[in-house]
UniProtKB/Swiss-Prot annotation:
The keyword Cytoplasm does not apply. Disruption phenotype: Mutant shows different biofilm kinetics, reaching maximal biofilm formation earlier than wild type. Mutation does not affect the capacity to colonize the plant root. The chain crosses the membrane at residues 24-44, 293-313. Residues 312-366 form the HAMP domain. PROSITE patterns: CHEMOTAXIS_TRANSDUC_2 (PS50111), HAMP (PS50885). SUPFAM superfamilies: Methyl-accepting chemotaxis protein (MCP) signaling domain, Sensory domain-like. SMART domains: HAMP (SM00304), MA (SM00283). The keyword Membrane applies. This is Methyl-accepting chemotaxis protein McpA. Residues 371-607 form the Methyl-accepting transducer domain. It comes from the Bacteria. It is found in: Cell membrane. Its main location: membrane.
Amino acid sequence: MSALRPPLIGSRSRNMNLKFRHKILLSACGVVVLAFALFTLYNDYLQRNTIRQNIEASVQQSGALTASSVQNWMSGRILVLENLAQDIGQQGAGDTLAGLIEQPSYTRNFLFTYLGQANGEFTQRPDAQMPAGYDPRQRPWYGAAANAGQTVLTAPYQGAVGGLMVTIATPVKSKRNGELIGVVGGDVTLDTLVEIINSVDFGGIGHAFLADANGQVIVSPNKDQVMKNLKDIYPGSNLRVAAGMQDVTLDGQDRIISFAPVAGLPSAQWYIGLSIDRDKAYAALSQFRTSAIIAMLIAVAAIAGLLGLLIPVLMSPLTTMGRAMRDIAEGEGDLTRRLAVQNKDEFGELATSFNRFVERIHASISEVSSATRLVHDLSEKVVSASNASIIGSEEQSMRTNSVAAAINELGAATQEIARNAADASQHASGASEQAHGGREVVEEAISAMTALSQRISESCAQIETLNASTDEIGKILDVIKGISQQTNLLALNAAIEAARAGEAGRGFAVVADEVRNLAHRTQESAEEIHRMITSLQVGSREAVHTMNTSQVSSEQTVQVANQAGERLASVTQRIGEIDGMNQSVATATEEQTAVVESLNLDITQINALNQQGVENLNETLRHCDQLAQQAGRLKQLVGSFRI
């Protein structure tokens, strides 16, 4: 808890540097600023709504009036043209047609008045030169009126002589049979509509314009916007030609747009658009904000001045009380002094509470003074007892260390015996395993020698059989030699007979000569085979003698190996007995080692506990010294108070 106090005090240092009168002054100014801010925001909200409602009402009224003016102007010309169509329908398109079209009521209201007949004839006043092959029936105004069967109004277009204009066209039907005579039309310039639109004034904060249902601007004070679409004029604004107020932005300027429909126009949907500068419309609101801020600053300055004069007067009792508390705190710690209570207000209650607090502190300090003396005496006694305990513990630690050293030596000797016994047992086990291995090797050698003796006997029999076979082969070779000799004689006789026969026996002589050569080679081969068989027979007899000698030696070796196997079995038995004794010794030694290690562990733990006890006593002694110092300090602090 004490570690958290410095940051807490530090975090409040900025507030503590301000005096209470300054805090009251700042709070009062803050309340005034907050009140004026809330009032300004609320009034701003009300005035904003009021201004928007007024703008909406004014826009609706102006839009309706302007739309009515446009409607009346266009309706008058439509009626004039429809009257012309009725007159032509009654009188027909004869010689009186030119006189009807040239009447002043038509020439004043239309730039051109004309009739396109069903037979392709075209009459226009004022008269003008038309292109060769001009057919009124192919013109859009003729087809639109004829198909609709009523008056139509074309889209605005740029005329050749009169600027921007529209065409009013209505069908002409005969009163006698109702057949279509043609279509009468009149070109109307929009200059009058421009004057009507430009006459709409909102006190310099906005203007009016005329647009169709597709958003194409027909009439506008800004000529750059004429015949352009609203989507191109206000890109990204999603402006719709519909009733209601819409907020858009043009060249970084916020504007309010509203539309009013122009009713009663045939085949056309026109709207009066009203564009108002938003900043100028809400200029009064900005002026009010500025006035409110100025009034707030004046009010804050006035309240700060008044409070600066009143607060010192109201705070005089608190100043007196603070001076008295400072005298008590900066004096000699005299707890017998009390504050004078002059009033029964909050400051009087504060002085009474302070006096009660000082009385409680006075009683507590008195009790602390007595307890401090008692704690100081007890701490000195505890220090003496701790010193005696430390001396006894150190003596006990020395004795315990001696016992631990002796047990460690005993444990080391026991471990050495256990290691030697384990090594002897391990060596005996190794010797036993080697003896077993030697016995197995001898037994395998005996088996191998026995098998070898048997194979030698079999080899002797096979060699004897081979010797007998070579004798038989020798006999066969003798027969072959005899046959070859006889063949040689027969070949010689055949050669002699062939010589006697002369030329007739020359071929037979050649054959006889070849037979003689073959018989000679056969005899030589038989002699060579006989020599080899003779040599083989000699080797076979020597091999038989050697095999017999080897068989006798192998039988003697088997007898010696059997005797060695019996001796190794006896050695293995004796080594096993020695191994068992070594294992018994090792087991007993290991048990003794475990007991010694247990004793050593107990002595070590006793020594550690003793050391811990000594450390605890030293720690207690240090704490007692600190307690004695704190008791002395507390005694000194208590002595600084006058009780």
